Amino acid sequence: MASITRDIFKAYDIRGIVGKTLTDDAAYFIGRAIAAKAAEKGIARIALGRDGRLSGPELMEHIQRGLTDSGISVLNVGMVTTPMLYFAAVNECGGSGVMITGSHNPPDYNGFKMMLGGDTLAGEAIQELLAIVEKDGFVAADKQGSVTEKDISGAYHDHIVGHVKLKRPINIAIDAGNGVGGAFAGKLYKGLGNEVTELFCEVDGNFPNHHPDPSKPENLQDLIAALKNGDAEIGLAFDGDADRLGVVTKDGNIIYPDRQLMLFAQDVLNRNPGAKVIFDVKSTRLLAPWIKEHGGEAIMEKTGHSFIKSAMKKTGALVAGEMSGHVFFKERWFGFDDGLYAGARLLEILSASDNPSEVLDNLPQSISTPELNISLPEGSNGHQVIEELAAKAEFEGATEIITIDGLRVEFPDGFGLMRASNTTPILVLRFEADTQAAIERIQNRFKAVIESNPHLIWPL
């Protein structure tokens, strides 16, 4: 039996510490397991790419060998963003691809995001890969799979520049956080006609300037300073593998993804009245009314890019987004999340205005908290903890209790959310309300529920 660390098999991907939980052998056996799943589906060719992490080339060599030893042919597209790998998978390999990426994790992490036949592997499908490894359920190959190397950056660039059209050039600043997006973003936005100030666009897997995670305000401070001190009208930031977008206005306001989605939804609905728009359970309560007001159907879904993608397939939604910064366009695009492409679509919308920051600042806004995290005791199951809390919880004055992903409690003047993270052993909390007094009242209701479990510590 192949030996492998079980807990690297996460809800949305495979991820671990390189050399410790994610070894070269593990990469090889994961390649063999993916090949076995591919064989079940009649898939013979898989696209393979990596981000800019230092461990990428070595892991790529071993997972590629696992695939080819099992008879799968590999289209190796080298160092790319995760969405560029998806682009190659969709256009060259029937929707099958493996991306070697640690996303926004610390430098010593890496992992794999996988899609087969157009479906993102997540949840049960990832556990099936683990079962294949543990049971040696690999396929014997009649012949070794071939490897073809191809640079797809030109085709990706030309596709976007060919169909995203700005009404005027915009002066922008971009911050790639030394992630792989930096190798492609500047050229793309210049190709669309913009003037671009580049921050930390040199790919460096040590991430020497700040962590490549635009969902955290501390990682946007350099971009905010560049906007304040320079001529740029708007700022865009990307995570380590460039599948997420952060947006900052000229005056330093962070436009969180649920408010970005208002603009994207309005734009898509202008051309497609009645279209469905999907958002995750963490999003602002102002989003659904906005979508309806602009003639769309609003659908709330579980947090997690794989859940959003499958909901898009099921419902035929044309655009979707989640609070972490993943934005998915089916209209004029392929339905996968892409930070660089979402940035291009944003610039297309904003180019109709002489004052992009004003357009963004005028989007509806409530008072809200950032994500608050509560660490869980070792070995506890977050989903079970939430169920136990919910069973004895009382929320006086609540208008609706939504349980699609944890517990989202709606009040006339705000909401509170607690859910279990699918990636780390924490509970995630978020609050939003019309006034500071309302947000404090809602937080106190949740505090009483949380503190009914003596092992949980209230984070405020």
UniProtKB/Swiss-Prot annotation:
Gene source species: Neisseria gonorrhoeae
Keywords: Carbohydrate metabolism, Cytoplasm, Glucose metabolism, Isomerase, Magnesium, Metal-binding, Phosphoprotein
Cofactor binding summary note: Binds 1 Mg(2+) ion per subunit.
Family: Belongs to the phosphohexose mutase family.
Entry function: This enzyme participates in both the breakdown and synthesis of glucose.
Name of the gene: pgm
Coiled coil: none
InterPro entries: A-D-PHexomutase_a/b/a-I, A-D-PHexomutase_a/b/a-I/II/III, A-D-PHexomutase_a/b/a-II, A-D-PHexomutase_a/b/a-III, A-D-PHexomutase_C, A-D-PHexomutase_C_sf, A-D-PHexomutase_CS, Alpha-D-phosphohexomutase_SF
A matching Pfam family: PGM_PMM_IV
Gene Ontology CC annotations of this record: cytoplasm
GO molecular function terms attached to this record: magnesium ion binding; phosphoglucomutase activity
Chain positions recorded as Mg(2+) binding sites: S103, D239, D241, D243
Binding site for substrate: S103, H104, K113, D243, R244, T303, E322, M323, S324
Keyword Zinc-finger part of the UniProt annotation: no
Active site (UniProt): S103 (phosphoserine intermediate)
Protein name (record): Phosphoglucomutase
Requisite cofactors: Mg(2+)
Subcellular location: Cytoplasm
Annotated EC: 5.4.2.2
Catalytic activities: alpha-D-glucose 1-phosphate = alpha-D-glucose 6-phosphate
BP GO annotations: glucose metabolic process
Top-level lineage group: Bacteria
